[in-house]
Amino acid sequence: VGSEMCIRDRLETALCLCANGVKVYLFDALRPTPELSFAVRHLHCNIGVNITASHNPKEYNGYKVYWDDGAQIVSPQDKEIIAEVNNIEDFSMVKTMDKDAAIDAGLLNVIGQEIDDAYIGELHKLVMNPEEIQKAGDLKIVYSPLHGTGLKPVTRVLSELGFKDVHVVEEQAVQDGNFPTVKSPNPEGAEAYALSLELAKKVGGELILVTDPDADRLGMYGYDSKNNEYKEFTGNMFGAILCDYVLMQRAQSGRLPDNPAIVTTVVITNMVKEICKKYNTFCDCNNLIGFKNIASRMRAYEQTGEHNYVFGLEDTFGCLPGTYARDKDSVGTLMLLCEAAAYYKNRGMTLWDRMVELWQEYGYYKEKVQTMKFDGREGAAKIQSMIQTLRDNPVQKVGTYSVEKIYDYKLGTETDAATGKSEAAVLPKSNMIYYQLADGAWFLVRPSGTEPKIKFYLGVKGTVSYTHLRAHETRGNLV
């Protein structure tokens, strides 16, 4: 059992489990979510629980449950657990016990430094070019934990690897669940970078990195030396850079396994697919949104031996660079980004320069998510009506792009837009519709699984300026 902020809730959860005869390992202090995922595997636990608000505003809280492989639960476990919760008719039915009694009974076991050491040790194994880090140890890194749990593991692993010029945003280094310096500590929002950008300009930072409060997601800005400005990286962008870097380094050193696979989701940038082709690596991308679905594929590989997992990523700023855990890990991701930055610095380049090179090699890809929110029961009904309308009345165009094929993940069908002919397709079950568009573009619509929102995802490809303009034009037409 661990938590990102809520100390009391962590202990209450542990004592409830102890009262039901369950042996519990309880972290002695706040820890990152990926470390809990690692600990479940390391300690051979049956389940893990993390109490966290994650990147949400301070009013929110969450209860993440992990299975014995360290992955967040999927069906049927999720439905079975919530059914038990709904069976509670009165809070007096919930058992608890005294902390000292639980310790004396051998049910409550406090863990800490030994798990930290084992976790950091696994991250060290991921480093591919330690000599590159030593040559560029003066890389100026600006880092903010956004009042969360990333501070200790991030600064520790960077220091141990030899990065000597790390500048922490002190105002955001204090763990505080009220997140006093930001409205929402979300790496996807520009607000989260205000203090980091200010510090970077002051110290001449080359790389700006932030982790969300439970340290599973990462955000990044990189320095553009040609224009003397900082550029924002989306999750798709730094995910593509890492896919390219990891596959390139492993291929060059002979460390790429047989039948390698990059695992991602259906809304990832198509650039990742092109990078995988270059390195003869399977891009496992027909997966539902959410990192638990990536973890599910990792488990399948272990059972079948069909592929060997190399790297996993999703568009929402989450990556897992190894098999030591089963949830996205900003600490390991940040570490590899810093290694890649050192590698390119030794060649007179920044990560922004490398991003431009990737665009020049594979084409300019741009992705965007548009969200519409509808509150209450009427809002929920409106969302379902919107997606059903799209299902019942197939569109021929999305903005200025012609529709070529329509994949309905709820019905399990593939439809040719020109002929209207449909046939069965092997698709994971979900209430979403994917449109394959002309010119390498795509569009997906789905209701959010956690909020009263409907989400529209768009990906386009082309020349830099032309694609940028068409992307904005299409988003406007969608809304």
Protein language model regions, located:
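Conserved small/polar residues in nucleotide/adenosyl-binding loops
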Residues: 1-9, 467-474
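Short acidic, glycine/serine/threonine-rich loops at helix termini
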Residues: 8-12, 37-41, 59-65, 152-157, ...
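N-terminal small/polar loop signature for handling phosphorylated ligands or for N-terminal nucleophile
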Residues: 8-60, 164-219
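Gly/Ser/Thr-enriched, mixed-charge loops and adjacent short helices
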Residues: 61-194, 198-200
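Phosphate-binding and adjacent anionic-ligand microenvironments
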Residues: 206-207, 229-231, 249-446, 453, ...
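Generic C-terminus detector
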Residues: 454, 458-470, 475, 479
